[in-house]
Curated annotation (Swiss-Prot):
Protein name: ATP-dependent helicase/nuclease subunit A
Keywords: ATP-binding, DNA damage, DNA repair, DNA-binding, Exonuclease, Helicase, Hydrolase, Isomerase, Nuclease, Nucleotide-binding
UniProt keyword annotation of 4Fe-4S present: no
Disulfide bonds: none
Biological source species: Desulfitobacterium hafniense (strain DSM 10664 / DCB-2)
Amino acid sequence: MNNPKWTPAQQAAIDLKGQLLVAAAAGSGKTAVLVQRLFKQITDVDEQVDVDRFLVVTFTKAAAAEMRERIGKALDEALFGAAEPAQVEHLLQQRALLYRASITTLHSFCMELIRQYFYLIELDPAFRVADEAEADLLRQDTLEDLFEAYYGEETPAFQSLVDAFGTDRDDQPLMASILRLHEFAMSQVHPGEWLEHLPAAYDWHSLDDLMESPWGQVVRQGVRDKVEEGLILLERAYRLAELPGGPVHYLPVLEDDQSRLGFLREMAEKGTWSDIETAFKSAAAFPGLPRGSKKNLPDSLIDEENSKRLREESKKARDEAKKKLEEIKNTVFSVPLTDQLPFLNKMGELVGTLAQVTQHFAREYQKAKRQRNCVDFSDLEHYALQLLAKDKQPTEIALKLQAYYAEVLVDEYQDINPVQERILQLVSRQEEGKANLFMVGDVKQSIYRFRMADPGLFLRKYGEFPHYQEGGGAAPNLVIDLNQNFRSRPEVIQGINYLFYQIMTEGAGEIVYDEQAALRPGAKFVSDGELRTAEGPIEVHLFDPKAIDLSLGQKRGAEDAATEVDSPAKGEGEEFEQNREPESGDDESSLEEAETARIEARLVAARIQKMVLEREFQIHDKELGDYRPVQYADIVILMRSLASVASVYAEEFQKAGIPVYAETNSGYFGTNEVDTVLSLLKIIDNPRLDIPFAAVLRSPLVGMNGTELGKLRSLLPQGDFYETLVLTFWAGDAHRQEEGHEFYSEIREILGKHWESLPQLEVKVRHILETSPEIKEKVDAFFPKLQEWRHRSRRTSLADLLWHLYEDTGYLAYVGTLPAGAQRQANLRVLYDRACRYEATNYRGLFRFLRFLEKFQSQGKDLGNASIVGEKENVVRFITVHSSKGLEFPVVFIAGLGKKFNTRSLSSQLLLHSHLGVGIPLIDIENQVRYPSVIQYAVKERLWQEALAEELRILYVALTRGKERLFLFGHQHKLAEAINKWRSLALSCPDTAFPDGQLRGAKTYLDWLGPALVRHPEDLFKLGSFPTASELPDSSSQWKVILHDQIAGKGPVQEATSSQDEIILPDQETLGEREASEETEIPGETEASGKTEIPGETKNSEETKTSEDKKNLEAQTPETADLDTKNLQEEVFRQLNWQYPYPEGVNQSAKTSVSELKRQSLWYMDNEYSSPSSSSSSSPSALSAPSFLRPQFIVSRKELTPAERGTAVHAAIQHLPLALWRDTWEELAQEVRESMLQEHIDSLIRREILSAEQGGAVSVSQLKNLLDSTSGKRLWEAEEVRREVPFTLSLRLRAQKEPVLVQGIIDAVLLSHQEHEAQVMDFKTDNLAGVPDPELVLTQRYGLQLGLYALAVERLLKVPVRECIIYATSLNREFVMQREAVQAALESVVIV
């Protein structure tokens, strides 16, 4: 295996023995370390442990496959260098054993264990793992059967449970609660014991005991947090009051407020409940603020407007502090604890019944699974536990595995749950001196609590085990911190450190971000001179959605902005403590969210366009070993959730011309094609369903329009569409109602139902068919098909039926012709796959399949659209932060940072926590009233704290995905007020990290980000210098804050003003003043911006007449023309003979390319000595049809054209890793050079930069000759080489009156910063063999082109061009043209 230079911490993780916890930060090379540790033990001469004696546990099959591949590659490399026969034999043996090695997911390990020892748990060896959808359906069926049995028994306890948790309509909420409780219990090591202990949380006889319990400690913490937030607000009010001109007469009252709240915080920490109640009553009794004014400035210095503002702001801050106390009152003190105690005991009985029913359900569910010979995923772990432990002690199987496995290695240890932890303990040795458990993970990236992951398992070891110190030795239990990041640029790492030093504390994030946790730069980015690399600040883009008019794409008017910004957003301020059910159907809120997402999407799209289209900077390509321009595929947009905004973003990006792909877990069932096919399946199963029937009739399957549907409905206003369809098919045809007709039974059934009104119906049918015969045609075509499909559904499998429908209707092919056809077809294939998977279960039939899908959707579940985008496609990708974990991207946009955290789960009346148990309200069943309970509050508060800690870790994961640049986007209502608040929060914090209470009060990511950025020494918000800013860790990090007030026009602005301790954002009219200075100059913009003259009217009488005719023509419209026949004939004649007054402009391009100009100059050169009759070519100034690249199916079968071969050679030269090879090229043997170049070409083919045919057209010898030539020497020795440099110039051509935009791409620009000059190099693949004077040919053919290149370099880079070089690949020779020579060629065509 290659020997990279390991850091001391990495080397310790590779070498040391014992039970090790490796805390591997993002990008620290944990996988490489794990593989090297394993490889070392396999190949070490002293150890040489067989690879199949290791258990390597990963969390995904992809990760397991990657690890197996890495180990295999390491073994292959070792084999290549092995010399000793014994060593070769050992390595070959390990290579063979690798395929049976236990490198697997934990579920796969459990499965293997169960299949080996199935007989010990009385499981059929042919068992299968149930699909999650099948398991859901089986759980639902089992629970419904169980409820029927309970209802039959009519037990009072169960009836009380239904009354408490059900509704007046049904018992679905109770069913959902039991299913949730069961799922949660199965994540515990002993589910039955955990359920049995739940009622203990409600068994209290004294308040003191309750307050000293875990639940009471959480209540204390909740009170302290709210009081802490109140004190911060009071501190802000106090600071405002003591400012010059402020309301100093408020100060005594504010001091008293702070004193009372400080005492309440002290009592919440250590007082009795009585002490807390007394202190709260005192703290909540806010006296009124004194009236009048006490001046702290002479009258001549007082600004009345500023004084009024300070008074209002101070009062507002104090009012917000009052609200924090009000929140405590509405939760902790809503019902006195003395009154709650008796109710708590009753709730304990209710919880006991709930636990009993859940256990009963668990037993019945197990029976149902055994009957079907299947298990679910939680069974795999619990059956494995049964095999490994008995009476909480290891079994013989466990001891056998402990003896067999030399070491157990666990990846992503921070994401395991207690059951998985117990399994790992049982298969590894735990005793001192023999411990062999190696755990790798990063608790800062633990973001899967919703999958029952418990980061506390990692945290406990991290806190208890000693930490490795460089130079230290092994210990029985040891933590090794890997904090060197080999992924990201230093600018990214420093910014992350600066932020998380301030916001990630043990109280808020469950781990403190300190020197051990902070990232250290470890990646080396190869430099190629002074390139426009991605080195730069982290950009933070903020906007107020109420201040931007989306319809106009710009800022709102001052009145609108003031009115709307000051009004609270819909639903804003709704706290989770209020325990209100979320109003998911709030249309106004949904519309507001969509509008905000649309604004943000446009801002993000504009930033991406600037980056990609203007080639703002280049990124480092690891495979290439060099820099290249940013592509769309390099960019990823991360969001917390895509469910509600992905479609909005995709729409806006498509409008902006940015290719985009969003992989979501929603929206599948809402697509037209899936909805249409499901509607068809529904009417095949039951044709009496009117809504799906109407959907099918309106779909392309039948093709009726609304009018035709209305006519059908008019036949039977009280009937259904199926009956009208049958009557229309019959249409009075006696033959179709005879007994021998194939649809006799269907027709007779409907006719019999309407026998009395049949004559009238027949008249109606005939009338409709006479006036609309197309209805009859459509019905006659569709009805027989429908009957045939219904018969087929009874005798064929569901999957076969579905595929037959696709083929019989042609619908699968049809949707492929629509926009996004490939996506639509993929969605329909997913539906077919789902049907196949459904039939692999114990369930069968169309009806049950449709019922399964209905239940699936009724539970709020959905599927994402089928993926049709490959990894290498050049598109911007939208993914969730969870999906991005473990990945890295060159450019990362993190959007939606202003969206409120989702607290819906905390609104449930049944809250679950692994340590605190079940939290339910106090339920008065008789009066159907619910009150908050102290237990429910404690559970809710702990869940909220843990959820916030996870949100903090999610932010960390998102930020650490970026390799080169980070861009953060978020919205903030009342942005100016928010910035003021952030400043106050920052001023009130003297420490590096913000107080835990403040951090736990966050509602959005910006609540963390804003105060931290306010403290930056660069004064990002233009607030004035901030005290102690430079003392913060990593305060030298680079950030840029951009405040947007519009999304069209000149673009974003960054603007703020300082006013002592407060900030007031400029009004909307002044925000645009600095736009010009914020914009980045676009190459060529100066030359192309608005300088083209518009030809005015001449005084020529004919042109004047033509202009008048044009005006007359524009005036002639169908609405205004009122001419008699003669005048009409004259007008028609005049219009038909009208000629455009500026014919010379028709054949002139407004934009052209360097290649086209070169072609034109060659045409004039060729035709200067030719007679008109001898030239068959047309004038080059005429617009010609564009030429397109040949389709891939032609390219793959035809020989490449010379132009295509030239393009391939240019691409190969463009991507040569010059910087990587510069120092070693001269020392390498010729065969090594050729091998490197061949690998370079193969790499371009693998990365799909070149096709296989193009790669074959590139000669290794040509590339080697270039690098070994004089031109190659120039490339090696240049201070800076820029390749494929695009430009746009505005030029005046001698052959054209109007200016023209000229675009081109320069092959290479060699810059000398020391001499302040440049060379232009162009690579030519022309076949010049046998040409007598190639220099003359090349000079005549390409002189103008090089002249344009030189002009572009001098104008845009502000560097004089000394000379231009043509390198001819066919001759392996360079030709140098001095600047004066190309200037002459340029001036022959261009007016310089």
